[in-house]
Amino acid sequence: MKEINRRSFVKNTAISSGALLTVPFSLDAMANSSNNKKLKLAVVGCGGRGTGAVIQALRSDKDVELVAMADAFKDNLEKSLKSILQELDGEIKVSVKEKNRFSGFNAYKMAIDLADVVILATPPGFRPEHFEYAINNDKHVFMEKPVATDSSGVRKVLKAAKLADKKQLN
């Protein structure tokens, strides 16, 4: 197994976190390359960061549609949806069906299964597992930094990132 040193860790983390800056451009490219098909978006982690990322993603292209939301706590999810609706009032139609609002610690799986693109804005201790699940299910992923909280989490993220490259996922 390749040894991870501080320099390679910082480099790989910077590259991974830089993906967040490209959300609008990448979503626009994905939406336009899919033959006018709506790009289905899910958010996992409905705090302030997740809510803001969803608003930014929805504003990036008219063919991006929020189809699912997941959070460990239902009240966070409902507060997030309310904020999204208020922020985009009349600008963009947002309609996440009740059956596509998932809460609990395994909620991320149900939301990810419904999407083409996933925003991971959960606490960093959960991101390696969520990222791995999304990549194994052929989903494009944007995630908050830091990507993990410990070395085993970082290794899991790096392994999943290599698989994402092979699958040509963003």
Segments the model singles out, each with a brief description of its role:
Residues 1-139, 156-168:
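N-terminal glycine-/serine-/threonine-rich beta1-alpha1-beta2 phosphate-ribose binding loop
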